[in-house]
Every structure is written in C-alpha cells, then in structure tokens.
Amino acid sequence: MILERTIGKAGTVAVGEFTPDGKLVAYKSNEAFSNDLAMMASQFAATVRMFLTTMAASFSHLTGLPLVPYQGFIFSGGDMSSVIRQDHWAIVRTAQSEFTPRGGAAERGLEELARLPGVRLAAYYASEIGEIECKQSMSLSPEVRATATEIVASTTSALRGLATAFEHLSTTRWTPVKGWLYAGGDWVIGVSPCCWLLAHSGEAETNELHRAVMR
C-alpha cells in the first residue's frame, strides 16, 4: 500500500489518501496529526489538483504542449513541503527531506538552470513586470512567453494564499513560498517567486528540478 511505502521516507509528517472531491480515505502520521487536520489536508489536495489541472489546460492551449493529464505536484514553503499525486498526499519537513536544496543549488544562474536535463526554457520574472530574461531551446514567441509567465505568476500567488490558509490550520510554517513543481502530460513546470522552468518529463528529474528552483 502506498501509505506504508511513503510514511517511512525521511522528514515525512503524514501521508493520506483522498477522493476526487476531497474526502479523506485513510491516513498515517509520524507526529501528532489529528483526523480533522487530515480531512482538511485532503480537501486542500483535491482543490489544488483541480486548480492545477485547469491551469495546465490553459497552458497547453496557449503553447500547444500537452501538460494534461495531471501527474503530480510538489510545493515547498516556510519549513514544510507537500506532494500531491493522483489520490495521495504527503506532508514533510523540508530540511529533513529529499527536497532540501543541495549545496549551491539556490545560487544557480539562468545558464545553469537551462542546462539541467530536459529543460527547454528557463526564465527570470517578476510578478509586477513579467519576464526579465529567458533562455530557451524551443520556439515559444515573446507573446506566448509573456502570457505563460503571467499564468505562472498568478498560480504562485494562488498557491501562496492556500499555503497561508493551511499554515493557520496546521500551526506549521508554509510561507513564504520557496518553490513548486507541476508534472502533467509530457511536461514539467518548476517555479519559484523569481524564476520558472519548462522541461520535458521524459528527460527531467523532478526532485532535482524542484531543488534547483527553490529560493
């Protein structure tokens, strides 16, 4: 069973199974983690999955790249990280987990990010002004990149709001946003508040990409 396999991973606080409409099926924890909180985590997981599926469908329509169906999501903020797969969620303490950035990862520049396995586009951006600089080995036009960057920035803002809400429910620190990653279709999007990557899932290593964008 997936819960038994994942509860033993380093840094794991709790893992759970949920239905598409956000109902808790089962959960296990390594720390004090109430049933009510597990129910809320399941509601958040279903909400995030539906929201990201909508975002990815829009991104696919814009770029012509298949980013659906949804495959998985990683979020890191404050002291915590979460993973949401098809019908399972996990909550971990980032510093004790595989998502901890390795030495120098947070200092990677745009050229180095663009050379990561599978990466086709790496860009710096600011939510107020859009794209600042971009390196790509694909042919997305400046207009398409501008809209894609706006989608990425607005998604980050929405996830920040959800993280703030869960922070108050769980009494653990989920903000500021450090990075998030979406995998769907044939592609992976990795995002921090200042940069984002687009990588082909057949070549990319998702945990490495997530660590690379974390700030």
Which positions does each model-derived feature cover?
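Non-catalytic interaction/Regulatory regions outside core domains
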Residues: 1-215
